[in-house]
C-alpha cells in the first residue's frame, strides 16, 4: 500500500531470515509494518511445524526489545488457526499488544498477524504489525493481507 512508503529489513523478529519489509510512520519513532521472509529454525533443533512457528514468532516479537518507552505491555486475544493460501497450508496467529503507558498519541496498542506457510522453498512468513486506531494503516494492512493471501 502507498502509505507504507519506507523499506527496511525488519528488526526484533526471531526465526526469520531474508526478510524485506514496508513501513508507515505512525508518529515520531513509531511505525506500522509488514514484511515477508523465510522461516529458519535454530540449528540443531527440529522445525516444530507452522503452527508452533507462528506462535513462537509472535511470542518472541512481543518479548523483543523494540517497544521503546512503552510500559505495562500485555499480549492479548491471541488466536492461532489453520489457513490455506493459494493451495499452500499453514497457520495464522493474531494477537494484540496493549500498552498500559505509551508515549504515542495516536495509538496505545499494536495488532500482530503472523502467517507461516509451507512453500516449495520451505516455510515462509508474512507478518503485519499495525498501530490500532490509525485507520489509514489498518485499512492498508487489511488491503495488503487480502491482496497477498485472499484471507481477510
In which residue ranges do the predicted regions lie?
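Sec-exported extracytoplasmic/periplasmic mature domains
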Residues: 2, 58-66, 146-150
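Generic hydrophobic, helix-prone segments enriched in Leu/Val/Ile
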Residues: 26, 34-38, 54-62, 112-114, ...
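A near-ubiquitous, low-amplitude feature marking generic local secondary-structure context
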Residues: 40, 44, 76, 124-131
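A generic structural signal for ordered alpha-helices
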Residues: 31-39, 71, 119-122, 126
Amino acid at each position: 500500500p502507498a502509505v507504507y512508503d519506507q523499506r527496511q529489513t525488519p528488526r526484533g523478529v526471531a526465526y526469520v531470515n531474508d526478510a524485506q519489509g514496508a513501513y508507515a510512520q505512525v508518529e515520531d519513532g513509531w511505525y506500522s509494518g509488514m514484511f515477508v521472509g523465510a522461516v529458519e529454525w535454530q540449528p540443531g533443533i527440529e522445525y516444530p511445524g507452522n503452527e508452533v512457528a507462528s506462535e513462537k514468532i509472535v511470542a518472541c516479537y512481543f518479548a523483543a526489545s523494540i517497544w521503546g518507552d512503552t510500559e505495562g505491555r500485555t499480549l492479548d486475544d491471541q488466536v492461532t488457526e489453520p489457513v490455506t493460501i493459494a493451495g499452500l497450508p499453514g497457520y495464522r496467529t493474531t494477537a494484540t499488544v496493549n500498552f498500559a503507558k505509551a508515549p504515542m498519541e495516536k495509538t496505545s496498542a499494536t495488532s500482530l498477524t503472523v502467517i507461516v506457510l509451507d512453500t516449495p522453498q520451505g516455510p515462509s512468513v508474512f507478518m503485519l504489525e499495525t498501530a490500532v486506531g490509525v485507520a489509514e494503516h489498518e485499512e492498508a494492512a487489511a488491503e495488503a493481507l487480502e491482496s497477498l493471501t485472499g484471507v481477510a
